[in-house]
């Protein structure tokens, strides 16, 4: 199964735009990006003589309405706004954050994922040896209200849901693609060192030492730990798209094991 981030178009500045709830934006992103990935993968597989179905699953993920993230939103999203527009958003009860020299942007909660609503559909397709694109952009965050699912004004960390999906499917391996070929110790410093292998215990020690930045490598390491604690026989590979072919052959990337 594959997971992708939300489309960058949702983050650009639009002078004339149609407002839509966050949950609808997430659904639009899944369809938009999933459509492109699905057709590109299908064409590539056929070019290689492989006849394998590729499907995009519109995926909802339940969250806890009392998750502390709703009380301290941290995820910056959406268009840049003027101070006047930002004040209007605040009056609506929304959170905003100023980006000096650029303007203001919405800030929403990033609650922890609880359950993947469409997990059985994903599992069935994967078991049938089909390529599945699911949980795009982290999934559509929803809150359970009796038998109904109500969209939440939030986003789910894509790395967190990747770890959740991998453990729910008992995958043998979780591959997380990022912008760097390895996980690094002392990243960006003179003594920066690439880490070829890590254990869960070592990863936890590095987190405690403040080695991984929030919003960049930290959520990837946390997702790896979450997955491996549920699937101890599995492994996690973290690398960049440019190095993924070598990484699969064991020539690049950071491998994390239990």
Segments (PLM) and residue ranges:
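C-terminal catalytic "cap/lid" subdomain
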Residues: 1-258
């Amino acid at each position: 199964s594959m997971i992708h981030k939300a489309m960058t178009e949702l983050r650009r500045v639009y002078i004339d735009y149609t407002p839509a709830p966050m949950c609808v934006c997430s659904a639009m992103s899944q369809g938009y990006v999933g459509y492109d990935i699905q057709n590109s993968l299908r064409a590539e597989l056929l070019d290689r003589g492989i006849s394998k179905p590729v499907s995009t699953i519109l995926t909802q993920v339940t969250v806890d309405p009392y998750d502390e993230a709703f009380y301290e939103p941290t995820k910056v999203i959406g268009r840049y706004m003027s101070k006047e527009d930002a004040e209007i958003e605040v009056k609506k009860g929304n959170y905003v954050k100023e980006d000096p020299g650029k303007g203001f942007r919405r800030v929403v909660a990033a609650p922890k994922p609880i359950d993947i609503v469409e997990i059985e559909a994903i599992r069935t397709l994967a078991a049938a040896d089909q390529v599945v694109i699911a949980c795009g952009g982290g999934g559509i965050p929803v809150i359970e209200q009796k038998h109904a699912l109500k969209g939440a004004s939030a986003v789910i960390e894509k790395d967190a849901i990747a770890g959740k999906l991998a453990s729910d499917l008992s995958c043998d391996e979780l591959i997380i693609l990022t912008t760097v070929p390895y996980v690094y110790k002392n990243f960006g410093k003179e003594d920066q060192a690439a880490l070829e292998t890590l254990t869960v215990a070592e990863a936890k020690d590095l987190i405690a030492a403040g080695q991984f930045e929030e919003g960049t490598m930290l959520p990837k390491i946390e997702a790896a730990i979450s997955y491996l604690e549920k699937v101890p026989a599995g492994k996690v590979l973290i690398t960049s798209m440019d190095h993924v072919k070598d990484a699969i052959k064991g020539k690049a990337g950071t491998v994390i094991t239990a």
